[in-house]
Curated annotation (Swiss-Prot):
This is Chemokine-like protein TAFA-2. The lineage of its organism: Eukaryota, Metazoa, Chordata, Craniata, Vertebrata. GO terms for biological process: memory; visual learning. Pfam families: TAFA. GO terms for cellular component: cytoplasm; extracellular space; nucleus. Residues 1-30 form the signal peptide. The keyword ATP-binding does not apply. InterPro entries: Chemokine-like_TAFA, TAFA_chemokine-like. Has a role as neurotrophic factor involved in neuronal survival and neurobiological functions. Its main location: cytoplasm. Keywords: Cytoplasm, Nucleus, Signal. One of its GO terms (molecular function) is receptor ligand activity. Belongs to the TAFA family.
Length: 131
């Protein structure tokens, strides 16, 4: 093989290695940035949404939330959005005290106290608490 061909091949391999190392560095940097991301104290953010329908064609939604609450607060729902609420509300299952429904909706605690419903006219949204 001639010397020029070997130089080009070596240069090509070197460029590929640099590209892979750069790409790998960005992936690692991105992963570390995601792990280090903090939610401002007293606030919540949705990190994942899930939506599907069951056999009865009733839409089911769930979400994963990341909150950073002040002492004495826990993750809850206010005006249909994730929020930090007084821990006693959740401990005693006084769900409607955290004002989980939108304005104009009526809040009712479910009979088994494992959640609440928000109703307006003939529309009912039920929320079950899972830990």
């Amino acid at each position: 093989m001639n010397k020029r061909y070997l130089q080009k091949a070596t240069k090509g391999k070197l460029l590929i290695i640099i590209f892979i190392v750069t790409l790998w560095g960005k992936v690692v940097s991105s992963a570390n940035h995601h792990k280090a991301h903090h939610v401002k104290t007293g606030t919540c953010e949705v990190v994942a949404l899930h939506r599907c329908c069951n056999k009865n064609k009733i839409e089911e939604r769930s979400q994963t939330v990341k909150c950073s609450c002040f002492p004495g607060q826990v993750t809850g729902t206010t005006r249909a959005a994730p929020s930090c609420v007084d821990a006693s509300i959740v401990e005693q299952k006084w769900w409607c005290h955290m004002q989980p429904c939108l304005e104009g909706e009526e809040c009712k605690v479910l009979p088994d106290r494992k959640g609440w419903s928000c109703s307006s006219g003939n529309k009912v949204k039920t929320t079950r608490v899972t830990h």
